[in-house]
Amino acid sequence: MLTDTQRDKWQKDGYVRLESFFAPAAQEDISNFVEDVSCWDVSDDKWLMWFEKTTDNRKIISKIENFLDFHDPLRRLLLEDQRIKSAVDDLLGEDSRRLKELLIFHYPDSGGYLPHQDIYHIPHKLPDRMVHAVVAVGIDDSDPENGGLFFSLGNHKKGVFPMDAGGVIDPQVAETFSWEPVVWKAGDIFIFDDYAPHYSRPNKSNRSRRTLYLVFQRASTGGPTRAEYNVLKRALNPPEGKVADLDNLKPPNGIFYRD
């Protein structure tokens, strides 16, 4: 499925973009299904939701996790043909398993994410690396103007960088990196190594930058199951409850910020 050029890009830079992975009709369905999910009520025991307060004092959804088990059409469209998993298996050189999924909505006037690595095992105080590849499914076009991602190429090979308790890479270290913007179109997928440093700015445009992330482990490594991970997640980073204080919303994680 993948070309040698794509495999080399993954090894060298820590990411690879697969253009037009979803046909236009499938992409439209995915976009509509994601909009369905954005309208769900808060759940105490199923999906996990976080919100943010805009500059004009509105509450907008920021992020949701653990939703695919509760939206059959979206799950089937993304996973049933195994194309995404096959691409991940190819890049990792072995079988993989899906740990989690999340949606970051990045609507206009939403916040950004400071430089970080997707180092899941460290905040959860687990001994072994538990994530090895993250697949970003482009729901909308993405570029720097609407809060698109920036990556530091090749730094996925250098292990874990110094970071604070929230997972933000030490600013003095991050300032030494060269950062490249990553642009994609709706329907593309973008697969990156979880050790690849990246960040995104607040969305100051009038365009959404919705992205659905599928997080994969190597099957040969240990780590929690999906159910075990969701228990860990609720304990470490509690989602919003059914009664929310607009001025005291629960943060989606330690790397999120608003200007």
Where are the model-predicted features located?
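Non-heme Fe(II)-dependent double-stranded beta-helix
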Residues: 1-12, 19-115, 121-124, 233
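Conserved hydrophobic/aromatic beta-strand scaffold that supports enzyme active sites
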Residues: 15-17, 114, 134-138, 179-181, ...
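Non-heme Fe(II)/2-oxoglutarate
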Residues: 31-32, 37-40, 45-48, 52, ...
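Residues that flank catalytic or metal-binding motifs in active/ligand-binding sites
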Residues: 70, 99, 131-133, 145-147, ...
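Short, structured patches in soluble enzyme cores that scaffold and shape functional sites
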Residues: 102, 117-119, 137-141, 153
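Short, P/G- and charge-enriched loop/turn segments at secondary-structure junctions
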Residues: 120-125, 177-179
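Short, conserved beta-strand element in jelly-roll/cupin
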Residues: 125-144, 191, 215-219
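Double-stranded beta-helix
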Residues: 142-199, 221, 238
